[in-house]
Amino acid sequence: MSDKTPRKPTAFRLEQPARVSAASEQEEPRRPRAVKDLEQITPQADVFDLTDDEAAELEILDPAFEAPERKGWSLSRILFGALGILVSFAIGIWTEDLIRALFARADWLGWTALGVAMVALAAFAAIILRELVALRRLASVQHLRKDAADAAERDDMAAARKAVDALRSIAAGIPETAKGRQLLDSLTDDIIDGRDLIRLAETEILRPLDREARTLVLNASKRVSIVTAISPRALVDIGYVIFESARLIRRLSQLYGGRPGTLGFIKFARRVIAHLAVTGTIAMGDSVMQQLVGHGLASRLSAKLGEGVVNGLMTARIGIAAMDVVRPFPFNAEKRPGIGDFIGDLARLNSDRNARK
């Protein structure tokens, strides 16, 4: 044991100067009081934004469209078919007479002409075969569109799976759809309602293509709008609108996996023109025209720039019509683009150009 005596218990006070000083220096809460002369910030209205009524009016002017199926032979088809047969006979007889005449003059000339004719015939047959394959692909896309709409309407799971498999086959060579196709592959053994499967395939596979298609339509509309604003002649405007519209239709068909040939492109163009003829002209409603050339933009856009906006909107309508025709599935889960999606960008583009002048 230790010899030291234990210390007696004593009381002592703990000093906490930091807490005491912090508590003493704490400010008293401010008493509530009324504040006058509040600064109000009023957002400036954008003259390029459409109201709900104007947007609804544009949607009415550009409804969705399904081309009716043609049955039987029309008089125009019979006429052009008969003329085509006559022209083929004429070319064949002319070629035969030419080869006979060359054989009569010199054998080597006749054999050379015959070889050239055979090469031309083989190339022509290859072109016809390629066009027939492209037309068959186009017809399959149109049938797929109808089958997908029927499967979604009837909620038929078997028909929906068949339509989705066809869509995956069409999109197999499109890199943007790889992620969506992998997702659908993982759901092969799952039980999904037919309508939900159609909507899922549209969302996962066609959504990236729809975004790219909107970009293509917007860029084409901007180019037409700018060329119209700077071109000195109306004939140049018309020519460029036709050129840009044809290129837009072909690029949209290639984007969605159509890959049309020459005849397929002509058929696409005819269906797009039929779309525009059925859904109405490019004429705007009263409220939209007032916004374009009246109250909102009259002080911002010159007459030439206003024409650029209208031509750009016409190109946008052609692009939307082309999307309706070449898209494998109808718009169901995704929102169908309308004129209102492009009018603001076109008006701002021309307004900025006018401001820089």
Curated annotation (Swiss-Prot):
Pfam families assigned to the protein according to its UniProt record, in alphabetical order: DUF697 (PF05128)
Membrane topology: Multi-pass membrane protein
Chain positions covered by the region annotation Disordered: 1-36
Transmembrane parts of this sequence: 78-98, 109-129
Name of the protein described by the UniProt record: UPF0283 membrane protein BMEI0952
Stated family: Belongs to the UPF0283 family.
Biased composition (Basic and acidic residues): 27-36
Keywords of the record: Cell inner membrane, Cell membrane, Membrane, Transmembrane, Transmembrane helix
Protein species of origin: Brucella melitensis biotype 1 (strain ATCC 23456 / CCUG 17765 / NCTC 10094 / 16M)
NCBIfam families found in the cross-reference section: hyp_HI0043
